[in-house]
Amino acid sequence: MAKKVMAMVKLQIPAGKATPAPPVGPALGQHGVNIMAFVKEYNERTAGQVGLIIPVEITVYADRTFSFVTKTPPASVLLKKAAGIETASGQPHVKKVGKVTRTKVREIAELKMPDLNAADVEAAVRMVEGTARSMGIEIVEG
């Protein structure tokens, strides 16, 4: 018989740098999960993606065991990395803060495809372009 699910916890944690400190500790501690076991396993699984923020969905079972699924990094994080900027624009329609080529947007869309609710890559590209526009990043041909 399948284990009884007690809780679903969603967090965004820097890859390879999870620690028992907030936000991980309190989020998992209240469900009685072995925090160090999660931290060790998460850091091992995300060691190759250091520098990115990786969303993770943790399923906590009634016997206090857990399983987790890592997702692809948020489009905004990938766009900021591609444009070489630290923060997005506070006024995206007035102040542009960076530029990204259309080919780079397509690469990001293809990477994000498993987590996006898009029928094809073209729809995913339009979603990523919309995110870029709302961040004040200009999309240029190339």
From Swiss-Prot:
Keywords: Methylation, Ribonucleoprotein, Ribosomal protein, RNA-binding, rRNA-binding
Gene Ontology cellular-component terms listed: cytosolic large ribosomal subunit
Molecular-function annotations in GO: large ribosomal subunit rRNA binding; structural constituent of ribosome
Spans through the membrane: none
Modification(s) after translation: One or more lysine residues are methylated.
Alphabetical list of Pfam families matching this protein: Ribosomal_L11, Ribosomal_L11_N
One GO BP annotation of this record: translation
Keyword Ribosomal protein annotated: yes
HAMAP family noted in UniProt: Ribosomal_uL11
UniProt function note: Forms part of the ribosomal stalk which helps the ribosome interact with GTP-bound translation factors.
Family per record: Belongs to the universal ribosomal protein uL11 family.
NCBIfam families to which the protein is assigned, alphabetical: L11_bact
Subunit-structure text: Part of the ribosomal stalk of the 50S ribosomal subunit. Interacts with L10 and the large rRNA to form the base of the stalk. L10 forms an elongated spine to which L12 dimers bind in a sequential fashion forming a multimeric L10(L12)X complex.
Designated name of the protein: Large ribosomal subunit protein uL11
